[in-house]
Amino acid sequence: MQRVTLTLDDDLLAALDALSARRGYHNRSEAVRDILRDALNQDPPSPESRRGYAVLSYVYEHEKRELASRLVATQHHHHDLSVATLHVHISHEDCLEIAVLKGDMAEVQHFADDVIAQRGVRHGHLQCLADD
């Protein structure tokens, strides 16, 4: 490991310390390492890491005109990527779906884009983990 020095303004340092306390980190370095890992996982995978896993989560209005049917059709069109899907009724109007995906990361990104772009889908998020 290498030692580095960071300069942070007071508000950002206070936020880091509060996060560290909430999550039970023993020191700031552990918190910064996890924050960096998370940020790096948010970037699209590099071309050399073409396969991997991903979690796609999104909320949608199940009564929106034919949205549920369109989402199911999209999932079936990309059936080879799907490992598992969890469906949760979070209110009378809204459903939360969480899909675990595996495969070519460009295809995974395309699938996520198709789902998130549907009218009535909110809070779409794709978390990627490329194979090492």
Curated annotation (Swiss-Prot):
UniProt keyword Transcription regulation, yes or no: yes
Cofactor comment: Binds 1 nickel ion per subunit.
Coiled-coil segments on the chain, per record: none
Any matching Pfam family: NikR_C
Entry keyword Transcription regulation: yes
Biological process, per Gene Ontology: response to nickel cation
Molecular function as annotated in GO: DNA-binding transcription factor activity; nickel cation binding; sequence-specific DNA binding
Known cofactor(s): Ni(2+)
Residues that hold Ni(2+) according to the record: H76, H87, H89, C95
PANTHER family assigned: NICKEL-RESPONSIVE REGULATOR
Subunit organization: Homotetramer.
NCBIfam families associated with the record: nikR (TIGR02793), PRK02967.1 (NF002815), PRK04460.1 (NF003381)
Family per record: Belongs to the transcriptional regulatory CopG/NikR family.
Role played: Transcriptional repressor of the nikABCDE operon. Is active in the presence of excessive concentrations of intracellular nickel.
Protein name (record): Nickel-responsive regulator
Species name: Klebsiella pneumoniae (strain 342)
